[in-house]
Amino acid sequence: MIVIPAVDIKNKKCVQLIQGNPDKKHIELDNPLEVAEKWIKCGAEMIHLVDLDSAIYGTDTNKETIKKIIESVPVPVEVGGGVRTVEDALNLIDLGAERVILGTSAVKNPEIITELLEKGINSEKIMVALDAKDGKVVIKGWMEKTEYTPIEIGKILEEKGAGSILFTNVDVEGLLDGIDIEPVKKLVDELNIPIIASGGITTYDDLLKLKEIGVDGVVVGSAIYKEMMDLKKAIKIVKGE
């Protein structure tokens, strides 16, 4: 299992939001590249970049910042936030993204995965973000609730050729209260593709629980920014060192 630090970008700055609310920030740092480099020095083997402006407003304010990070860091970078079309995904892959994270677009129209595969994009480069609230998948920056469970959507996405799922439990995201293991376990048990877990991961114990149920990776955000968790130590613990 790999521990992936999140670098969320809003208006060219690195931020951490509370439950995805653009008006509720509890961290704001001026230089996202420096933040990414700091996490790599701690042993991060991948960086999880999210373009919040693109996700929330559909703007490309952060394009140059993202490009600079991808070009500057020595580890793979996965990028999400506002990847709405095949063209958006291809542009990020052209910038050098190791994986693109599709959200609402793939949940509403799983054919986007087929189209990317037809363009010659390897399925390992296609990750789909499944965000759940009260047991149902939510879309459009967590603003709109669907009638479907993560497993129902996850199976469709897997069938279409998604390479991995990024699962975020919105109920616990950014609250620093720890994880709810059950919904993650259900997804791991029901799907065959790798599951990356996100949302509420606060303690080393959370990491070990996720490792135990077979999660392939975890994205950590608030806990490392608020220094409740030491990234270097977290990576060592997960590796069993």
Curated annotation (Swiss-Prot):
Pathway, per Swiss-Prot/TrEMBL?
Amino-acid biosynthesis; L-histidine biosynthesis; L-histidine from 5-phospho-alpha-D-ribose 1-diphosphate: step 4/9
Active-site positions on this chain? D8, D131
Q: Cross-referenced InterPro entries, in alphabetical order? A: Aldolase_TIM, His_biosynth, HisA_bact_arch, Isoase_HisA-like, Isoase_HisA-like_bact, RibuloseP-bd_barrel
Q: Where in the cell is it found?
A: Cytoplasm
- Please cite one Gene Ontology biological process associated with this protein: L-histidine biosynthetic process
Gene Ontology terms for molecular function: 1-(5-phosphoribosyl)-5-[(5-phosphoribosylamino)methylideneamino]imidazole-4-carboxamide isomerase activity
What is this enzyme's catalytic activity, as reactions? 1-(5-phospho-beta-D-ribosyl)-5-[(5-phospho-beta-D-ribosylamino)methylideneamino]imidazole-4-carboxamide = 5-[(5-phospho-1-deoxy-D-ribulos-1-ylimino)methylamino]-1-(5-phospho-beta-D-ribosyl)imidazole-4-carboxamide
One GO CC annotation: cytoplasm
Q: Which UniProt keywords apply?
A: Amino-acid biosynthesis, Cytoplasm, Histidine biosynthesis, Isomerase
By its UniProt entry, which PANTHER family does this protein fall under? 1-(5-PHOSPHORIBOSYL)-5-[(5-PHOSPHORIBOSYLAMINO)METHYLIDENEAMINO] IMIDAZOLE-4-CARBOXAMIDE ISOMERASE
Q: Which HAMAP family match?
A: HisA (MF_01014)
Q: What family does this belong to?
A: Belongs to the HisA/HisF family.
Tell me the protein's name.
1-(5-phosphoribosyl)-5-[(5-phosphoribosylamino)methylideneamino] imidazole-4-carboxamide isomerase
Q: What is the lineage of its organism?
A: Archaea, Methanobacteriati, Methanobacteriota, Methanomada group, Methanococci
